[in-house]
Regions:
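Compositionally biased terminal segments of proteins
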Residues: 1-169
Length: 169
């Protein structure tokens, strides 16, 4: 992953160290989580949930490690000049319940806590249905939903009808 991200610094490993140092429960969601359950696809975005009461500790530790911290409405972006990889701490409260169902998986060579497959699907459905997101992002979310359903066909029954129809077009 570090080579793909043109990284002088392994920012994902740095994040794992920050999470351990701050004793933060976490799980990966988004495209990287999809890769844990379907054919892996490399992405330069890593979407992570941490317990709500640890967000400040994680961002403080990230700043101490010279990461740039940008706080937005429902996420905190962590970036480094030494890597193209972007870490997004999702702060939308809907995701907090995913933490209790997360499982340990190896993803692209990293041992990670990953949201359950049904939670990953739910997160992708929320993202796809969010009309405020760019169309290109929503199309990627739909492709990720398709990847999950292809790898786990029983998930199709959990999709809203509008998305199920799109998958069968």
């Amino acid at each position: 992953m570090n080579a793909v991200a043109h990284g002088e610094t392994d920012i994902l490993q740095l994040l794992l160290e920050i999470l351990a140092k701050t004793c933060s429960a976490y799980c990966v969601i988004g495209g990287l989580a999809v890769s844990a359950y379907a054919e892996p696809v490399v992405s330069l975005d890593v979407d992570v949930i941490v317990t709500a009461d640890k967000v400040d500790a994680v961002t403080a530790a990230a700043r101490a490690q010279a990461l740039k911290v940008e706080q937005l409405e429902h996420r905190v972006n962590l970036t480094s000049e030494k890597s193209d990889l972007r870490i997004q701490l999702q702060t939308d409260p809907r995701y907090q319940e995913f933490l209790s169902r997360a499982v340990q998986k190896e993803v692209l060579g990293y041992p990670l806590r990953v949201a359950s497959v049904t939670d990953v699907l739910q997160g992708k459905v929320w993202a796809y249905l969010d009309k405020s997101r760019r169309r290109s992002k929503r199309q990627k979310d739909l492709a990720d939903i398709m990847r999950l359903v292809e790898a786990h066909p029983t998930l199709e029954a959990q999709l809203p009808p509008s998305i199920g129809q799109k998958l069968n077009e």
